[in-house]
UniProtKB/Swiss-Prot annotation:
It comes from Lachnoclostridium phytofermentans (strain ATCC 700394 / DSM 18823 / ISDg). Residues 721-796 form the Smr domain. Endonuclease that is involved in the suppression of homologous recombination and thus may have a key role in the control of bacterial genetic diversity. Gene3D superfamilies: 3.30.1370.110, P-loop containing nucleotide triphosphate hydrolases. The gene is mutS2. This is Endonuclease MutS2.
Length: 796
């Protein structure tokens, strides 16, 4: 993209806004290097990255890249095997800390599988491949406190040396303290302090005593009144301290070398982390800019078609900017904009040009969703007064020089923008030149926008296929532009109307009208009529919008009324459902009692008659319950057609009393697949209810093939009973009740967990199972089932 267009359209100001949102120096570097792209796939990729980052910003908040250092030079030193300093290692630690922060922000894992919250997008892989290298980072942080300080615990050797240094220091201070407090030396001291000179402990001795005091002189004050002397009593200790300092430095260098070797093994991961963090910083800066500008992702096409919906120039104060709609490149490829000065013509040009540059650079544009941009290899712009004083060029010459260059280089893949084409010279010749230039560009099918004051160009646009007029609206009443762009309508000269409004006499205005040609006045009358028609159309449109709002309000009230009716219906159905639950509970209680009696009577023949009577009563009771519930359900349930079901609908599977979602459309027989949790089953539509249409009437009671009753899910029972810790007299009633419920729920087998212990509880359970008639058999658990701590019970 040519530099002149970038400068003219103020693209660099957008880049400055973008760079300010990057947190790291490398991120800002990438922002400053951003230029428009020309490959569709690259542009779409960058746009999607910006959108995905924006989605994450709204979902999780900001991700900080602030303070991430540039370690490129450090990595180059690692390449040649150099040992790093403490400061360099701390920079690497900062990068690794930022890497971990980014990893946690962008990629969540659970059980080694990506969670649903961490949705796949264009950024997921970047986050996933980041390597925080936590062991290395922790080791650096453990060993290095700051650029000037290594931790005592960095190595046993360093800890030992520093302990010896402390001991030696203490000895020196003890010895010097004795000297300071000695009566024989108090008079020799300039000050009663201990000082350091050339790395050795000294005392400040008065100049006249420097030869009397026993020791080695290392320095003297600037006035010569004080000599700094190392007492002979601590010379040996000072020597030891110097040796220990050398050993300390050797230990530190050893620690830094070991850390450098450790870091060098991961230099490629470090390089990837640095590069990826810079890219993410760059991407999230683009997302932040989109958020600040309230922008949206534009759609792109290869048809050179532009359709900007409510576009706002990003460099104009958001409180003052007026959104504009601009479209061209479909039915017409040349747009001629007319209107008053300061009316918004130039802003319209710059908006189209700047949006094109921003979009092709992967930036969102401040416009409504659904806006479209096209890809142009070059954008050429001749906007504003670019007169060159150095070259002594007039305004016209300057613009014409630029125009000549544009005509030489532009092709059908270019976007050309002219502001006041042909201005700065004789109006007749200027208009002729402007028409010739636009005609030339139009013949070559080059997408062009041009602003003008010339009426001849309005006529050119009206009479030429593929060319359209547009104007910036001006209010004669307020004498102010509205900044609205009206496509399809040429701009009308408002000079006479404005002059009259400002008080110019009618005589002068009428005299002026005589000086313009009848043809020109007729043309202005046509434009006036068009403007009047447009205003009338907008009035009709406003009335239609009002009618639409009234209809919507009526629809809303009707929906509220229907909602109240539905609520009443739902209440009635809930009451019916509760009644069904009551009937079902009564049937269950009756069945429980009957089974207990059956167990009590046992298999003896004397009680056969009583048992048979109870069976008959139970069958009658359950039959009544079943018929009652089924009839209520069928009466209240809507019969659905195959066309009523769509993939994703929430449904109630009546026979299973489970909720699920439709995963396929019904086949010719009315069968479709329903996903119920991890279960996917083929179900006929006659066995389904749409949950959002009708509240479930009753929990279905369906007969199984064996004739037993399968209870609803709400009355389902656990497949195991834990009685560990219970006494026999406490456990057996629980076992008895549990077996009854499990048998009624039609469980094929259950597990009783009694534990090993003394075996008394297991024996009591086994004895009880032998007396239970509907138990087919039992056994202790096998390997993996609980062994002798559980009993597996199988029902008849």
């Amino acid at each position: 993209m040519n530099e002149k267009a970038l400068r003219t359209l103020e693209y660099h100001k957008i880049i400055e806004k973008l760079s300010a949102l990057a947190g790291s120096s490398l991120g800002r570097e990438k922002c400053h290097q951003l230029l428009p792209l020309v490959k569709l796939e690259d542009i779409v990729q960058m746009q999607q990255e910006t959108t995905d980052a924006l989605t994450r910003l709204y979902a999780k908040g900001t991700l900080s890249f602030s303070g991430i250092p540039d370690i490129r030079d450090t990595l180059m030193r690692l390449e040649i095997g150099a040992s790093l300093g403490a400061g360099e290692l701390l920079k690497i630690s900062s990068v690794l800390t930022a890497t971990l922060r980014a990893k946690n922000y962008g990629y969540n894992q659970k059980n080694n599988e990506e969670t649903e919250e961490a949705a796949q997008d264009t950024l997921t892989e970047r986050f996933h491949l980041l390597e925080p290298l936590s062991p290395i980072n922790n080791e650096i942080r453990r060993c290095i406190i700051s650029e000037e300080e290594i931790a005592d615990d960095a190595s046993p050797g360093l800890k030992s040396v520093r302990r010896q240094i402390k001991i030696t220091n203490d000895k020196i201070h003890e010895s010097l303290g004795s000297i300071l407090n000695s009566a024989s030396t108090k008079g020799m001291l300039q000050d009663a302090i201990i000082t350091m000179r050339n790395g050795r402990y000294c005392l400040p001795i008065k100049q006249e005593y420097k030869n009397t005091f026993q020791g080695m002189m290392h320095d003297q004050s600037s006035t010569g009144s004080t000599a700094f002397i190392e007492p002979m009593a601590i010379v040996k200790l000072n020597n030891e301290l110097a040796e220990l300092a050398v050993r300390e430095q050797e230990e530190i260098e050893k620690i830094l070398a070991e850390l450098s070797n450790l870091v060098a093994t991961e230099k490629y991961n470090l390089k990837y982390n640095q590069t990826t963090l810079a890219e993410l910083d760059f991407i999230f800066a683009r997302a932040g800019l989109s958020k600040n500008m309230k922008a949206s992702q534009p759609h792109f096409n290869n048809r050179h078609y532009i359709n900007i919906k409510k576009g706002r120039h990003p460099l104009i104060d958001p409180k003052k900017v007026v959104p504009i709609d601009i479209y061209f490149g479909d039915k017409f490829d040349l747009l001629v904009i007319t209107g008053p000065n300061t009316g918004g013509k130039t802003v319209s040009l710059k908006t189209v040009g700047l949006f094109t540059l921003m979009g092709q650079a992967g930036l969102h544009i401040p416009a409504f969703d659904g806006s479209e941009l096209s890809i142009f290899e070059e954008v050429y712009a001749d906007i504003g007064d670019e007169q060159s004083i150095e070259q002594s060029l007039s305004t016209f010459s300057s613009h014409m020089t630029n125009t000549v260059s544009i005509l030489e280089h532009a092709n059908e893949n270019s976007l050309v923008l002219f502001d006041e084409l042909g201005a700065g010279t004789d109006p007749t010749e200027g208009a002729a030149l402007a028409m010739a230039i636009l005609s030339y560009l139009h013949q070559r099918k080059i997408r062009t926008m041009a602003t003008t004051h010339y009426s001849e160009l309005k006529i050119f646009a009206l009479s030429t296929d593929g060319v359209s007029n547009a104007c910036c609206e001006f209010s004669v009443e307020t004498l102010q532009p509205t900044y609205r762009l009206l496509i399809g309508i040429p701009g009308k000269s408002n000079a006479f109307a404005i002059s009259s409004k400002l008080g110019l006499s009618n005589y002068i205005i009428e005299k002026a009208r005589e000086f313009i040609g009848t043809k020109d006045e007729s043309f202005e009358d046509v434009i006036s009529n068009l403007e009047a028609s447009r205003i009338a159309m907008e009035k009709d449109k406003a009335e239609a919008e009002q009618y639409k709002k009234e209809v919507e309000e009526l629809k809303r009230k009707l929906a509220e009324k229907n909602s109240k009716i539905d609520d009443a219906k739902d209440r009635i159905l809930r009451e019916a459902n509760e009644k069904a639950r009551t009937i079902l509970q009564e049937a269950k209680d009756y069945a429980d009692e009957t089974i207990r009696k059956y167990n009590k009577w046992g298999a003896g023949g004397a009680n056969n008659k009583e048992m048979e009577n109870e069976r008959a009563a139970l069958r009658e009771k359950l039959g009544d319950t079943d018929s009652s519930l089924v009839s209520k359900a069928k009466k209240n349930r809507k019969q659905h057609k195959p066309s009523d079901f769509k993939v994703g609908d929430s449904v109630h599977v009546i026979s299973l009393n489970l909720k699920g979602s439709v995963s396929t459309l019904p086949n010719a027989k009315g069968d479709l697949y329903v996903q119920m949790g991890i279960l996917r089953s083929l179900v006929n539509i006659s066995d389904l209810e749409l949950i959002d249409e009708e509240t479930i009437v009753a929990k279905a009671l369906t007969k199984t093939q064996s004739g037993k009753i399968r209870m609803s899910k709400s009355m389902s029972i656990s497949p195991e009973l834990n009685i560990i810790g219970k006494r026999v007299d406490e456990a057996l009633p629980l076992v008895d009740k549990y077996l009854d419920d499990a048998y009624l729920a039609h469980l094929p087998q259950v597990t009783i967990i009694h534990g090993r212990g003394t075996g008394a509880l297991k024996e009591a359970v086994h004895a009880h199972l032998k007396r239970t008639n509907y138990v087919k058999g039992y056994r202790v658990g096998g390997f993996g089932e609980g062994d002798h701590g559980v009993t597996i019970v199988e029902f008849k």
